[in-house]
């Protein structure tokens, strides 16, 4: 298998990823700003399928209408010249100080109304550029102190905002769905909708739930100490995996945004295995930050590494699934039984079945080994290149 990516692999990058200048809370930028046109051209050369953006990534905040149109025109020309697509867009509702207390859930009503108008304006651009998914990350929606935010009212306002946005895209006839991106712990101390589970529960309360799904990110779920592939599996099970952000993370700490494959490599293997086996057809979107130690050559090497690592893990996962010893180990672990209904015969027959309870040999069942260690070691062998 070739590890050289092509557009058919559907790899995408945000302008803000390779465009991150290395500025953090403790240090200034270490790299110059990248022109979005340059980003499109370089990513196309690397084999990417598309590029995504926040409104302020493409059009500097405060630009006049004339300046805005000029930025859009140059960007569109770069897309046309390279064949790159824009499968997703989003709104920056977190950088400007006006959003210091949030956007859709800010205590100030006028800020909430401004946030909705800012979002709607960029939705129009997203639809114009062909995006099918609109991501919403509520990074400033939350609090640091208990009395500062009535969470129930804040969730009411969050619901109101998404219902209005759903009404808007429906009224405009846009073929666009929303993907809510959960994240815990930063930048607000306590953020609303911090995990996939929170977001899935919230979506069920919306007026048009079919328009809303989730955009899980590797590092975000791991920041909460959760299993990312399990979160992805539940989103798939619910029919709500509308988009996905791939990067690397090493356990419960700040949002590292390492290149994909760095950090928890075992989790990355199972995530790729799941996406490929489940038939996920959306973009494989990399939301990472090239370390501030790197110059621009290092930025592009980091982006290329994201795609290469995905393709290597895709090959490793396929070899694992095709290995006859693995298939035997899966049977020994009785995974095939998990796929069978527990009581397809119905409640009445279950209650009448003495083998299910009265005559069930608890001790014999307890003594049965599950053979999980053999199965897991085979996975490790494939991951480490010792098999296949």
Curated annotation (Swiss-Prot):
Note describing how the cofactor binds: Binds 2 magnesium ions per subunit.
EC class of the enzyme, as a word: isomerase
EC id: 5.3.1.5
Gene label: xylA
The entry's keywords: Carbohydrate metabolism, Cytoplasm, Isomerase, Magnesium, Metal-binding, Xylose metabolism
Lineage, opening ranks: Bacteria, Bacillati, Actinomycetota, Actinomycetes, Kitasatosporales
Organism from which the protein derives: Streptomyces olivaceoviridis (Streptomyces corchorusii)
One term of GO molecular function: magnesium ion binding
GO terms classed as biological process: D-xylose metabolic process
Record's protein name: Xylose isomerase
Chief place of localization: cytoplasm
InterPro entries the UniProt entry points to: Xyl_isomerase-like_sf, Xyl_isomerase-like_TIM-brl, XylA_actinobac, Xylose_isomerase
Active site as annotated: 54, 57
């Amino acid at each position: 298998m070739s590890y050289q990516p092509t557009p058919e692999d559907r790899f995408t990058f945000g302008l803000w990823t390779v465009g991150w200048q290395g500025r953090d809370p403790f240090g200034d930028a270490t790299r110059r700003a990248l022109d979005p046109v340059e980003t499109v051209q370089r990513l196309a050369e690397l084999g990417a399928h598309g590029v995504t953006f926040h409104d302020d990534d493409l059009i500097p905040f405060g630009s006049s209408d004339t300046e805005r149109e000029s930025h859009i025109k140059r960007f569109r020309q770069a897309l046309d010249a390279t064949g790159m697509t824009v499968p997703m867009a989003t709104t920056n509702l977190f950088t400007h100080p006006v959003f210091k207390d949030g956007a859709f859930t800010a205590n100030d009503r006028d800020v909430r109304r401004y946030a909705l108008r800012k979002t709607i304006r960029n939705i129009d651009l997203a639809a114009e550029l062909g995006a099918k998914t609109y991501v919403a990350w509520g990074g400033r929606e939350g609090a640091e102190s208990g009395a500062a935010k009535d969470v129930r009212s804040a969730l009411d306002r969050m619901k109101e905002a998404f219902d209005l946005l759903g009404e808007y895209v429906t009224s405009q006839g846009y073929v666009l769905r929303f993907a809510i991106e959960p994240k815990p712990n930063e930048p607000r101390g306590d953020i609303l909708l911090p995990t996939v589970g929170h977001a899935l529960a919230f979506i069920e309360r919306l007026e048009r739930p079919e328009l809303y799904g989730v955009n899980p990110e590797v590092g975000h779920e791991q920041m909460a100490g959760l299993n990312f592939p399990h979160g992805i599996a539940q989103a798939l099970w619910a029919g709500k995996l509308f988009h996905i952000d791939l990067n690397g993370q090493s356990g419960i700490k700040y949002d590292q945004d390492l290149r994909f494959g760095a950090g928890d490599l075992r989790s990355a293997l199972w995530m790729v295995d799941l996406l490929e086996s489940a038939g996920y057809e959306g973009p494989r979107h990399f939301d990472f930050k090239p370390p501030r130690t790197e110059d621009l050559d290092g930025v592009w090497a980091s982006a290329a590494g994201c795609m290469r690592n995905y393709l290597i893990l895709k090959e490793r996962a396929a070899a694992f699934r095709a290995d006859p010893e693995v298939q035997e180990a899966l049977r020994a672990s009785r995974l095939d039984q998990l796929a069978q209904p527990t009581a397809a015969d119905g409640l009445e027959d279950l209650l009448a079945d003495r083998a299910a309870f009265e005559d069930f040999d608890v001790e014999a069942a307890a003594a049965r080994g599950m053979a999980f260690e053999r199965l897991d070691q085979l996975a490790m062998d494939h991951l480490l290149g010792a098999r296949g």
